[in-house]
């Protein structure tokens, strides 16, 4: 299906065609960087849900450039293949799988990313609550893999839809980042519910053990049960067991809240 006449009249659509961008969404990332300098000092970047590649294209032009800096490494991840881009390594993978995070780190020679971005979105149904929920789950999946692959102090940017539960999303991100804000670049249509969540200075909770979790959290009771079992067994715990218990205790608080905003656990998060 061809582009609508509305798209063809859009200044950014025309500009994208003129400048050779794969999609008008390239300007959204460019404008976020121009206002917030998210590319400053960045060497290792991950583009999640990257296809068709307009954001990876921005990274290729703005960060990889002429390729003279051997420390610059860009990884694009998507279930779909996309046309090659200069300086961008592509991973055809699922962001909800731990194996994908290991592939990313291997391309960084064991180091972690400075910046992780995601412009992904599920198919829109036109039903606001369903679309907002689907997008929120995609963001949390991106956050899951980010906790495995982003360095302390790093930055995370993701597309989201404006909705009633934005305060919940804000609270979830604030558990991991010092600074969290919602931004809307001028190239994002005013009529669109699209926003971007900008998270800076990654600082995970003390004793948080990164793991890839089911966004629906069907098995989160296993975490709680493991915590209780480890607390009740082995009264003569050694130091290692005590440390393990601290990790489990932290997970039993953080993981349910991140996965679905579950606050019905009888605990405080601080």
Curated annotation (Swiss-Prot):
InterPro entries listed in its UniProt record: RNA_methyltr_E_TRM7, RNA_methyltr_RlmE, RNA_MeTrfase_FtsJ_dom, rRNA-MeTfrase_E, SAM-dependent_MTases_sf
Principal EC category: transferase
The keyword DNA repair is assigned to this record: no
MF terms in GO: S-adenosyl-L-methionine binding; tRNA (cytidine(32)/guanosine(34)-2'-O)-methyltransferase activity; tRNA (guanine) methyltransferase activity; tRNA methyltransferase activity
Protein location: Cytoplasm
Positions with a binding annotation for S-adenosyl-L-methionine: 53, 55, 78, 94, 119
Pfam families: FtsJ
GO cellular component terms given for this protein: cytoplasm; cytosol
Catalyzed reactions per annotation: cytidine(32)/guanosine(34) in tRNA + 2 S-adenosyl-L-methionine = 2'-O-methylcytidine(32)/2'-O-methylguanosine(34) in tRNA + 2 S-adenosyl-L-homocysteine + 2 H(+)
EC numbers: 2.1.1.205
Any one of the GO BP annotations: neurogenesis
Highest taxon of source: Eukaryota
Active-site residue list: 159
Keywords on record: Cytoplasm, Methyltransferase, S-adenosyl-L-methionine, Transferase, tRNA processing
Function: Methylates the 2'-O-ribose of nucleotides at positions 32 and 34 of the tRNA anticodon loop of substrate tRNAs.
Family membership: Belongs to the class I-like SAM-binding methyltransferase superfamily. RNA methyltransferase RlmE family. TRM7 subfamily.
HAMAP family recorded: RNA_methyltr_E (MF_01547), RNA_methyltr_E_TRM7 (MF_03162)
Name of protein: Putative tRNA (cytidine(32)/guanosine(34)-2'-O)-methyltransferase
Gene: fsjA
């Amino acid at each position: 299906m061809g582009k609508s006449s509305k798209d063809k009249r859009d200044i950014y659509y025309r500009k994208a065609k003129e400048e050779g961008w794969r999609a008008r969404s390239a300007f959204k990332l460019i404008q976020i960087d121009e206002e917030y300098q998210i590319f400053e000092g960045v060497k290792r970047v991950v583009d999640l849900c990257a296809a068709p590649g307009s954001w990876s294209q921005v990274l290729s032009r703005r960060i990889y450039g002429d390729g003279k800096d051997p420390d610059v490494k860009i990884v694009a991840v998507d279930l779909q293949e996309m046309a090659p881009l200069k300086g961008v390594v592509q991973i055809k993978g699922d962001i909800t799988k731990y194996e994908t995070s290991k592939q990313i780190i291997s391309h960084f020679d064991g180091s972690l990313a400075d910046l992780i971005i995601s412009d992904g979105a599920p198919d829109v149904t036109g039903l606001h609550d369903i679309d907002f929920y689907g997008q929120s789950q995609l963001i949390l999946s991106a956050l899951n893999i980010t906790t495995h692959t982003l360095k302390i102090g790093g930055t995370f940017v993701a597309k989201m839809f404006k909705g009633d539960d934005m305060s919940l999303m804000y609270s979830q991100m604030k558990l991991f980042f010092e600074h969290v804000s919602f931004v809307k670049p001028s190239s994002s249509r005013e009529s669109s519910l699209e926003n971007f969540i900008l998270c800076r200075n990654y600082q995970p909770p003390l004793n948080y053990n990164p793991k890839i979790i089911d966004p629906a959290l069907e098995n989160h009771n296993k975490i709680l049960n493991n915590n209780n079992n480890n607390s009740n067994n082995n009264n003569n715990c050694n130091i290692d067991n005590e440390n393990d218990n601290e990790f489990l205790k932290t997970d039993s608080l953080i993981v349910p809240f991140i996965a679905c905003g579950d606050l019905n656990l009888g605990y405080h998060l601080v």
